[in-house]
Each structure stands twice: as structure tokens, then as C-alpha cells.
Amino acid sequence: LMPFVPNANDLAQWLAADRGRSISLGTSAWQPNERIVGLFDIHKGEKRGDWKLSFETLTTTQRTIHLKGIHNVDGNRPLQNLTYSSAKGLATQAVAMAKVFSKRGTSIAVAQTIPDAWSIARKVAAELEPFVQVHEDIKLVQRFLAAEISEDFELIDMLSKGVVVHHAGLPAEALSLIEWLTEAGHIRVMCATTTIAQGLNFPVSSVFLATRKLPYGNEMSHRAFWNLAGRAGRIGHDSVGVIGIAAGAQPNEIRKYVSDATASLVSRLEGMLDDLQAAGELANLSWVMQQEQWADFRSYIAHLWNEKRNLDAVIGEAEQLLRNTYGFGSLRAKADKASQEKADALLEATKGYVRKLAEHPENASLADVTGFSPEGVRSTLLDMNNLENKLTLADWEPSSLFGDKSKSVLPSLMGIMLRVPQLQESLKEISKGQGNSHRKLADITQAWVTGSSIESIAKTYFEGDSLTDQISKACRAVYRDLANNGAWGLSALSKMPTSGLDFEAMTDEEKRRLNNLPAMLYHGVKTEEGVLMRMNSVPRSIAERAGEDFKARTEAGAENTLSPRKASEYLKSLKPDDWARLKPDNSSLSGEDYLKVWKRLSGEA
């Protein structure tokens, strides 16, 4: 059932070797949408500074076959403010196409990076008039952005023209509300990054890509491209979707990319072995396996070891255990000598690694619990053991960890996380810039958990050419990197034998407080009741106050334990006046606004 994967039979055999069968839908004319896929290009006009766009159709469906060929798009200068020289950028051409096609419904322009997405959003917003009457839904989202991010946030004014951005530099709640506005038909042009391809389902009429390259230069897979193409003209949304890629300097490459509509699903494991064989390094696999790109495989073997905990059993069953991976199974299924050599090398290297794990089985057990590789576990244990002062339960209390900076152990813990391979890449991205990296990480974490606004964090800790740039960096750092990897790291470190924590000797209340630490970091609040509010989709700006009120009401009742179910019941009971009583004094959202936003975010609307 995976579209655009021709080797379905291989997958079926891997998933169920004894009874796997692929099912072909090839006799059916079914498609997720009626669409035209092509490439667009810029052409110099007759007068100085003039330019125009063309669209060349590359693939059509039965109902759109009459649209084959090359078509002019919207006459001279689709973006009137730009001359030919300033419109030559591929992202600018993409947003010019999106502006033209926005007359048919929401159109998406896809840029390579977050700054590019903002840049083209500014260009198209400068060309559009504000709505004669801005819809109340848009005004609500504008007030939300002012309250939760900044009153000076650039997106607020863009919304008045039906222009939005969609990327990792926005909070998840803001993205959710932007998607809601799109579904409701209030958005003309969306300027996004390629993350837009990840499972979104809002109706758009067209999608235009500046490039098929992802932010770090890798080519977008065919599956990702066709998934993105599937956003346009979905059945029940719009009749015909238009998808275009900028021709750029190598239009023939685009033509080939689109014509190669499918690509076999290839195991990452098999790909790494191919590279080793090509480099003549297959015999050194046991040594190469210690490198970072093999961390996921090492963690998988550690998991297998942890399940058996018997050296002879794991080595004896290694072949069968490896067959459970798609890569090894694919190699064994091939008759050629090269494939068998790769499979044999992997089997022997795996057995060698299992013997190594057996020397320190506790590392494999902790790898299974924490998600770190066994080597990451070992270095973390040593780092925590080498701290100047041994950790105690008091150090892990939220009031201590996120409190007085001079006494908190958080900088030390962040320093340890920065040396864990699974965490370090994204955390180092946050801590770039002047000063001590682990101190900066700890300061941002403390500011986030103790209630500092995104605007304040952006201005204090992130450099940029504009407030928008600073806010984008802060949102990406906090909502994507810190909330995920920081929370993961904090949870993992608390489970280490050298953490100074003895969960067996703790009271239930102490355990609960400690187990809530990662959630506090994830949600940006400092109390258990605040976490419960955020888990139930309460905006961060009001979560702590609502949590205090919830706790007071619960403790006054007969059964005074806090729980997600009780939090949900409490929130459903609140009236607009209650939200108004709890809201921050300086918030641009009214009590009625908070209620509407909460209902929308929680799915209660």
C-alpha cells in the first residue's frame, strides 16, 4: 500500500517471509488527486527590467492531458515590485507562481531554508492588498501570536493579507492554528520549507518548489516529492492540483527527476555496506561499526542482547536475528557473491560486537532504557561520576535544577549531554555563539521553564538580522531541539546509576516530581499542575495560572490527586469569565479568546 515503491514484494517478504504477498493496485486508475506536474522558468521581457514566467507540463492525468505543453503564466512581471534581476532567485520564482495560482485557492511556495521562506513571504505580502474585512478567525490567531510570541512578530501583519509561513521556526501550536486557517480557506499563499511534506492534510490548489534539495543539500526522495505533490488538488478539495519545480540552470535534471516517478525502498544498512565494499573497507567492519553512522545499528544489537542476556544464545541466533532487519534479509535473498560477502561480514562483525557487550552487560541494559548507544551510556556514566560534587536528590528537585543559577547542576548536566552522540548535534546548534556552550544551554532552559517569553529568550540568547530572525532561531531551538533532545537527555541522565537518585527509596510524590522534569522542559512550565495544563493544550502564557487554580480546586475536593483526566474535566468546566480571571494582565487575548484557542488546539471545537 506504499505508493511509488516498486519493490513491494521485497517488503512483503521481509515483513512476513512465510506468507508475505504484495497487492497490486495497478489495474485501477485510482490516484489521490487530479494533478499536473511540471517545471517553471523565468524569461527576460522586452522592456528593461521586465520578466515573465512559463510552465512546462511534464506529467498529466487522463483528465488533464489536454494541458500538455508550455504555457505562459500571468503576463508581465507577476510580482510587480521586482525587476528581472531581482526575480531570478528560484525561491522568488516559486512564490511568484504561488501568487498567480492563489486565485484558485491556497498555494504553497516551498523554499529550502527558514530565512528563504521568510524572504519570499515578505515579497509576496508586499504585492497583495490586505483583506477588505479581516476574518475573525484570522484576528484570533493574530492575537494569539501577539500573546504567545511577540506583539511585533512579522507574521501578524502578513496574516491580514492572507500570507503565512510554515516551518520549524514556529511553535507547534502556531503551526496548528495556521493549518486551521488554511483548511478554512482564509490563506492565499503559504511560504514553507520542505517539512511541509510530512503528513499534512490541508486543502491547497498548487505547490511550487524552488528546489528539490533539502536544507543540507540532500535530494528530496521521490516518495517525499510525491507525498508533497499529493497535497494539491486532493479528492474532495480541489479539482486539479498544479505542482511545479523551478527549472533553474539544469532543467533536464528536473525532467528526469519527475519521470523517475518511483524508487525502490533501499535499506540504509545495505547502503552503508555498499559504501564500505566500494572503499575496500568491508574487512574492517568491526572497527568501522564504532563510527557514529552505525550508532542506530549498535543500539539495535544492544536491544537484542538485552532481551536474551545470554552470549551463546545471541551468537547462535545472530543470523536469524539479523534476518529481521530489511537490509540483512535483502542481502541474503540475493544470489550474487558481493551480497553474500556483505552479509557474512555483517554477521561476523555483529558477533564480535555482542562479545564486547557481554563484557559490560549493564551498558546494554541502560542503552535499552535510555535510547543512547552503549558507548554513549559508558561515557555518560563516567562523566557523571567525574563531576566535582556528587549528585543528590536535592540537586534534581525542580526548584533547584531550574532555580538559582549559581547553585544549579543544570550546566553540568548540559555539558554531559553535549558529549552524548545521540544528543550533541541539535544541542550544539542551540549553543552556537559567544560564551560557554553548556552554560548558555542551561540559561535558555531555565528561562524557558520559569516562564520567560519567546521574545525575551530570542532577544537575550539569539543573534539575528531582525527580530523575526531571532524569534525563528529561538522557536526552532526551544520547540524542536531543546524540548525533544533536552527532555530526552534529562530523562536518560536521571536513570543512570551515577545520578545520585535511588528511586526505590523515594516516596511516590518524589518519584512523580522527578518523572515530571522532562515534561517541564518539554512544555516550558515549572510545576506539575502546569504540565497537566500544557498536556491538555492550554497556551503556555496562561498554563501556570490555570494550573494553580486547578490545584486549589482539586485540593479542596474529596479526592485531591492531580491527574490528566481531572485536568481535562476542569478545563471543560471553565467559562469565558474564568479564563478572563486567569489570563495575564498584559495579554492581547481575552478570556473568550483563550477559550476558543484552547478548544481549537485540544480538538474540543
Where are these regions (language model features)?
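Conserved C-terminal RecA-like helicase domain
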Residues: 85-189, 216-226
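Conserved segment of the helicase C-terminal RecA-like domain
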Residues: 202, 206, 212-262
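Short glycine-/polar-rich loops that comprise or flank the Walker A/P-loop
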Residues: 19-23, 33-34, 105, 160-161, ...
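Conserved nucleotide-binding/hydrolysis micro-motifs of P-loop NTPases
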Residues: 3-8, 30-34, 113-117, 170-171, ...
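C-terminal accessory/interaction regions of large nucleic acid-associated machines
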Residues: 289-307, 313, 338-605
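C-terminal or mid-to-C-terminal helical accessory/interaction module adjacent to the motor/catalytic core
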Residues: 241, 249-312
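Conserved interdomain linker/interface between the two RecA-like ATPase lobes of SF2 helicase motors
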Residues: 4-121, 164
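Beta-edge loop/turn motif
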Residues: 1, 111-115, 175-212, 230
